[in-house]
Amino acid sequence: MNAQELRDKTPDELRDQLAALKKEAFNLRFQQATGQLENTARMRSVRRDVARVATILTEKAAAAAATE
């Protein structure tokens, strides 16, 4: 997922996606702790996706506040 795709989504969709990504990160941490995680690079990509979504949400909130 790239930033442009995220900017096209509504804030509600972004919040839903953020919750799903955080849940996935939680599950990946448990898999790593129990030794079941095979693709360790997925943790990094999920962590970066969480940051990307949070950044876009902040940008949208700032833009909404600036227009009011």
UniProtKB/Swiss-Prot annotation:
Spell out the InterPro entries in the cross-references.
Ribosomal_protein_uL29, Ribosomal_uL29, Ribosomal_uL29_CS, Ribosomal_uL29_sf
| Gene Ontology molecular function | structural constituent of ribosome
What PROSITE patterns does this protein map onto?
Answer: RIBOSOMAL_L29
Record keywords, A-Z: Ribonucleoprotein, Ribosomal protein
One CC-aspect GO term: cytosolic large ribosomal subunit
**Keyword flag Ribosomal protein:** yes
Tell me which CDD domains the record gives: Ribosomal_L29_HIP
Domain of life the protein comes from: Bacteria
- One annotated GO biological process: translation
Intrachain disulfide bonds: none
Q: Which family is it part of?
A: Belongs to the universal ribosomal protein uL29 family.
> Could you tell me which HAMAP family the record lists for this protein?
Ribosomal_uL29
What is the protein name given in its UniProt record? Large ribosomal subunit protein uL29
Biological source species: Dinoroseobacter shibae (strain DSM 16493 / NCIMB 14021 / DFL 12)
